[in-house]
Amino acid sequence: MKIVTYNVNGLRQRVSQFDSLLKLLDSFDADIICFQETKLRRQELTADLAIADGYESFFSCTRTSEKGRTGYSGVATFCRVKSASSSCETALPVTAEEGITGLVNSNSRGGKSETSTVAEGLEEYEKEELLMIDQEGRCVITDHGHFVVFNVYGPRAVADDADRIEFKHRFYGVLERRWECLLRQGRRVFVVGDLNIAPFAMDRCEAGPDFEKNEFRKWFRSLLVERGGSFSDVFRSKHPERKDAFTCWSSSSGAEQFNYGSRIDHILVAGSCLHQDEDKQGHSFLACHVKECDILTEYKRFKNENMPTRWKGGLVTKFKGSDHVPVFISFDDLPDIPEHSTPPLASRYLPMIYGFQQTLVSVFKKRRANEEAKAIEVSCSSSTQSNTSSICGDISTGPLRNCGSMGISLEKSCSFENKSTSGVTEAETVAATGSIDNLSDGIRASSVRALNISRDGDRKKARKIQSSQLSLKSFFTTNSKVNNVEDSSSSYVSSSPSSQVESITEPNVSGKEDSEPTTSTQEQDQTGSSAKQKNDAALMEWQRIQNLMQNSIPLCKGHKEACVARVVKKPGPTFGRRFYVCSRAEKQTVVISNGLHQNSETSKRVMRSK
């Protein structure tokens, strides 16, 4: 059996690198694969990231909304199985749990998250404090019968960040309580993952004299058997004297080229062996069952065109891959366990993967709503057709002499019906035209029907469209035009019927519809052109600044080579400031005959700030 732990630094990117999740998982040839730093929120889980043939997956995603930590962490455990419905395989867990407190229990089959009881051994902690610990999605626990696997992504805390240091203390304190409780029950515990702790000086390149005095390193060493604890650091137990065995390097400084890194990805094992001998002296799971544990240094983590050349120097390159390497443990095949099914926490049961289960009530409600919508649609279409036919029928049955005197055709009468939807009410139409008593009965009926249709819905759409085009000035312009028409209405009344109809069609409809959009369009064009000019000016200025910075890159004082730009990401007064450093990769210090020669990293100080 084989277990692999790997900080993927973004699961989506690693899946894209291998073209599919299945190819990524098969590349390890392992039974249990533990990923850290998946950088996925729960709503971002999709089948292509969580489901692969022959594997069952269990995720823990970040739930915090804290700035800078949304979708930041996250862990996932993939188990290779032959049958998911019912199996005796050890790789398929009997139970699975998200988080370490027992309070985060995803009822995946129902699509909801419910609160469970506090895990055994954590009763003295406040409930709110425990909930905060599991908000960042840093652990998945799977019980495989013979052993319990803790897939852990430990918090990172810099020296001057008191809040994160306190959180790291609470996290590992609660985690240790869970381990102790299981060990008292006689269970075997495997802890795998990125713990963000290098326990010994030999686990860090160029560790300082006070390196091992760090409180978290002291806590890690207190867990080990040789220090009176219950756990064994499997890699160090198998390779006690190996140096320069690192699992993580800084990608920003190209440190992997010179193996300038640290060992922070671990596999810890605690518990007895499976032998039934009464004399347990010298027996342990590590001594009796573990065959090998090593670092997969040659594992393909980069795209082919970006594969680094290790320990051969060169300029810094931004590698497109994880800044960690996998670590594996292999041990003898274990006996099968009683037949069991896939735990409810499995991704196959997540609502975003398999969908939400509908109830009978929701099905009938949806069907009734669809029937009502269809009935309304049919009634609306039939009423619209009848109104249109009656309007055109009234116009066609009107006196031919009126149509001749108007000088318009049937199409123009229907266009008058559509134009009435521009927001002109019946009172405004009457005021603008003086009187409509001289119109024929057919034209009067069609006008009234057109106004009714506009009130029922078409006028709302027209107003919505025009509201995005009109400016405040255009409303005053419209009012002035209507007032001018009202003042001159008496002159239209004294004219012939044909001139009255012309006054309706020309000043009220055509004049109003043509003039207003022209004014608003001109104003929009002027506003858009001025904004475009400002954007173009800002873009040109920024390009000028970039060209100036590019042409004024300083040289490294030691190597006389062009430096590279960096940005300060540490919170403080210099946050966001740009500076220059040596372009060569980070490496160890070299001692030569005439004294101490500093490495390129320690010599690349700030050359110029921007």
UniProtKB/Swiss-Prot annotation:
InterPro entries linked: AP_endonuc_1, Endo/exonu/phosph_ase_sf, Endo/exonuclease/phosphatase, Znf_GRF
Zinc finger (GRF-type): 556-606
Keyword Acyltransferase among UniProt keywords: no
SUPFAM superfamilies: DNase I-like
Catalytic EC class: hydrolase
Active-site residues annotated for this sequence: H324 (proton acceptor)
Observed effect of gene inactivation: No visible phenotype. Ape2 arp double mutants have no visible phenotype. Ape1l ape2 double mutants are embryo lethal.
Biological role stated in the UniProt entry: Exhibits apurinic/apyrimidinic (AP) endonuclease activity in vitro. By contrast, another report show that APE2 has no biochemical activity. Unable to catalyze the conversion of 3'-phosphor-alpha,beta-unsaturated aldehyde (3'-PUA) to 3'-OH. Has no in vitro 3'-phosphatase activity. Redundant with APE1L and at least one functional allele is required for seed viability. Has a strong non-specific affinity to DNA.
Name of the protein described by the UniProt record: DNA-(apurinic or apyrimidinic site) endonuclease 2
Organism expressing this protein natively: Arabidopsis thaliana
Gene name of the encoded protein: APE2
